[in-house]
């Protein structure tokens, strides 16, 4: 089965909205062993949509079309599909009834514009959407089934799992004798990881894939076929050994996800005191339901005054060593832990840039500490200064990795190839 994707919307094409739907969909399909072989983004222009539907339907077996099913004038997917096939739009009575019931349930009068969402190409097969007002539909054109989905991420995900995947499984023989292992790495570039893994001898049916997303590189190990799947565990172990300390999680998309799972299960508590990361660590952890079971508090102590008043950092420490120093960040972590007697406390302080650096402490200089009941661990590092965002994201990730290693009773402080150590 040759799978393609067409993404629609002027805001997506112009970059005003980041197209996370396309990345999510391709990732879900890849995990099933189905590769998305072609993707194109089209703006809200009727003639362009018609042309791309006709052209791509000559090459693909299945095309997932995302977006353009709303009630406004720039939602043109249904109209363009009808024109591409040379047939009229007709009202789908079932979906009109569904819309009327939906608005009545909330004691609201249905705007006339929503009737547009019940107008489908004459040959279309309606696809239910129980979580939104835009139904999906599918149409056969030339060689391909075009499967139309809403642009709202939650609605797309529901429709893909509940409708699209069952459809392709029923229509095509998918080679689902496949599996994938995902390793999250930190502190080493993609090219360097690729060079290291080029030395790993891969049996037939096993391949590598890489995904870069700040500040991580995700290594995917794909196995296709029963024999390859049986060897996947052994190859994954070889990869972990080859990469060493830069592997920070397995089967997770972030260190925060790894820490959440471990703290949630362990019963340990955590406090956080952040300066340069500005609440980023607290935000990443509290994004997860259930984080209240372990996350006690997060303090953003950006100024020296707040470090003194809220965390008990001595003014003399700041005068002697500065805000970005081992002494200060250790005092921040100890102060945060003592407030509620947390099992662990993380603290960060640094110069994220683009300004504020000095000759002694240039932009990218960061101090990180982890306070525990058994002692305090700290390090001062120089991070790549490509952007303020990178410095802050990488600082948060290193802090979380220190905590992860403490939870696993491993060496808390390790060297990352792309990070320069200044002190510990």
UniProtKB/Swiss-Prot annotation:
<protein>
    <recommendedName>
        <fullName>CinA-like protein</fullName>
    </recommendedName>
</protein>
<dbReference type="Pfam" id="PF00994">
    <property type="entry name" value="MoCF_biosynth"/>
</dbReference>
<dbReference type="InterPro" id="IPR050101">
    <property type="entry name" value="CinA"/>
</dbReference>
<dbReference type="Pfam" id="PF02464">
    <property type="entry name" value="CinA"/>
</dbReference>
<comment type="similarity">
    <text>Belongs to the CinA family.</text>
</comment>
<dbReference type="InterPro" id="IPR008135">
    <property type="entry name" value="Competence-induced_CinA"/>
</dbReference>
<dbReference type="InterPro" id="IPR008136">
    <property type="entry name" value="CinA_C"/>
</dbReference>
<dbReference type="InterPro" id="IPR036653">
    <property type="entry name" value="CinA-like_C"/>
</dbReference>
<dbReference type="InterPro" id="IPR001453">
    <property type="entry name" value="MoaB/Mog_dom"/>
</dbReference>
<dbReference type="InterPro" id="IPR036425">
    <property type="entry name" value="MoaB/Mog-like_dom_sf"/>
</dbReference>
């Amino acid at each position: 089965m040759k799978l393609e994707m067409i993404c629609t919307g002027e805001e997506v094409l112009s970059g005003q909205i980041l197209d996370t739907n396309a990345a999510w969909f391709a990732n879900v399909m890849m995990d099933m062993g189905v590769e998305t072989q072609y993707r194109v983004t089209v703006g809200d222009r009727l003639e362009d949509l018609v042309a791309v539907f006709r052209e791509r339907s000559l090459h693909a077996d299945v095309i997932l079309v995302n977006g353009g099913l709303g009630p406004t004038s720039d939602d043109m997917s249904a109209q363009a599909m009808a024109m591409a096939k040379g047939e009229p739009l007709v009202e789908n009575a079932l979906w009109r009834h569904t819309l009327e019931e939906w608005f009545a349930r909330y004691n609201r009068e249905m705007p006339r514009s929503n009737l547009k969402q019940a107008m489908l190409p004459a040959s279309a097969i309606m696809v239910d959407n129980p979580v939104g007002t835009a139904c999906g539909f599918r149409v056969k054109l030339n060689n391909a089934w075009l499967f139309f989905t809403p642009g709202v991420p939650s609605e797309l995900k529901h429709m893909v799992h509940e409708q699209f995947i069952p459809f392709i499984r029923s229509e095509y023989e998918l080679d689902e004798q496949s599996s994938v292992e995902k390793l999250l790495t930190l502190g080493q570039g993609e090219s360097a990881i690729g060079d290291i893994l080029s030395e790993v001898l891969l049996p037939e049916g096993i391949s590598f894939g890489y995904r870069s997303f700040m500040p991580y590189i995700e290594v995917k190990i794909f196995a296709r076929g029963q024999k390859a799947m049986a060897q996947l565990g052994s190859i994954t172990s070889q990869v972990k050994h080859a990469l060493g300390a830069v592997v920070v999680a397995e089967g997770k998309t972030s260190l925060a996800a790894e820490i959440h799972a471990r703290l949630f299960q362990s019963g340990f508590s955590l406090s956080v005191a952040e300066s340069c990361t500005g609440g980023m660590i607290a935000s990443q952890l509290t994004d997860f339901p259930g984080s209240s079971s372990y996350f006690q508090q997060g303090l953003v102590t950006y100024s020296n005054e707040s470090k003194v008043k809220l965390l008990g950092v001595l003014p003399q420490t700041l005068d002697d060593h500065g805000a970005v120093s081992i002494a200060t960040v250790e005092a921040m972590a100890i102060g945060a832990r003592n407030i509620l007697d947390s099992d662990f406390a993380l603290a960060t302080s640094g110069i994220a840039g683009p300004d504020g650096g000095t000759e002694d402490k240039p932009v990218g200089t960061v101090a990180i500490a982890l306070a525990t009941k058994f002692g305090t661990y700290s390090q001062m590092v120089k991070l790549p200064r490509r952007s303020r965002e990178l410095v802050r994201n990488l600082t948060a990730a290193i802090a979380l990795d220190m905590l992860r290693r403490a939870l696993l009773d491993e060496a808390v402080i390790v060297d990352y190839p792309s990070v320069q150590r200044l002190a510990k």
